[in-house]
Structures are given as C-alpha cells and as structure tokens.
C-alpha cells in the first residue's frame, strides 16, 4: 500500500527525515513514536505531499504522491487544526468534506451517527464556528472529517493530544 523510497528532507543543515526504504502493507496499523522534533510530522506532511522532499518519493497504491492526486480519493488525514476551515460550523464543514467525496447531505448525516459518542453532544447543533471550539473538539472534528468517506488509508498526527481520557 505505501512504499517510502530514499526519502530525505532537510531544514537548513538539520536532516529531519532520512528513510532508505520502508513498506507499509494494506491492513497494517502503525504508530510513530519519537521525541519532539524527531521528524514524525514532517514524514506525514511528505506522505501527504504537503512538503516537497529533497530526495526520494512516497508511493501509495502504486501512485507517486508528488506526481498525481489520485491517492487523495482513498486517503483521509488530519495533521492539525490548520486542516479545518474554521469560519464554518462543524455541520457545514462535514457537508463540505462529504461533497468533495460525492456524498449527499443525508449520507453525511448517516456517516456521522457512529461518532455521536465521540462528539459527546458538544460538536453538532451548537451553532458555533469551528474557531470557537476547544482544541479537543477541533481535534474531534478533524478526525471525524478524515474518516467520513471511509478511507483505505488514514493518517492522523497525534490524534489523542487534546482529547479527554473519557
């Protein structure tokens, strides 16, 4: 599913990512652990073609992410609240994301049902813009939107950072 080949990214003199070769197979679940500044987020941004690699490439389902956008159809991601359109309500944002994947409003509503417990009555129906939500609720909105279209590949960066233990 994912092949990382000779991937390098430097910021000035600091080598942030240096991966000779790594394969992630369909169905694998992988967690990256490392110190702050170790390159985890940089790797995710390279995988999502949000950063240009200095060398190498990332291939998802035989698609080089830097050469085509077809991989986006089966990939969901949430890196940080910069992914959110914070002048929308959560409902508007979910419908916007759904529309990008060809989902009707009714389908989006149906796909939100399994997330009701996660939202804890604090996200939907609040008549607030995303910018006015807590960091934890923004995190929930981002995670849910990344999963809305049932992606084959889900990339989440520090997904539990701002979430309550409950």
State where each predicted segment sits.
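Conserved ABC transporter NBD signature motif
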Residues: 56-71
């Amino acid at each position: 599913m994912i092949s990382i080949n000779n991937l390098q990214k430097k910021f000035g003199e600091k080598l942030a990512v240096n991966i000779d070769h790594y394969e992630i197979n369909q169905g694998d679940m992988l967690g990256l652990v490392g110190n702050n500044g170790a390159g985890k987020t940089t790797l995710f941004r390279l995988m999502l073609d949000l950063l240009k690699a200095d060398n190498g490439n990332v291939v998802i389902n035989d698609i080089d992410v830097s050469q085509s956008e077809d991989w986006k159809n089966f990939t969901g991601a949430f890196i940080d609240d910069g992914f959110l359109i914070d002048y929308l309500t959560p409902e508007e944002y979910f419908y916007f994301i759904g529309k990008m994947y060809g989902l009707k409003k009714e389908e989006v509503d149906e796909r939100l049902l399994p997330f009701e417990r996660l939202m804890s009555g604090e996200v939907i129906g609040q008549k607030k813009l995303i910018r006015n939500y807590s960091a934890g609720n923004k995190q929930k909105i981002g995670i849910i939107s990344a999963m809305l279209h049932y992606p084959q590949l889900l990339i989440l960066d520090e997904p539990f950072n701002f979430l309550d233990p409950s």
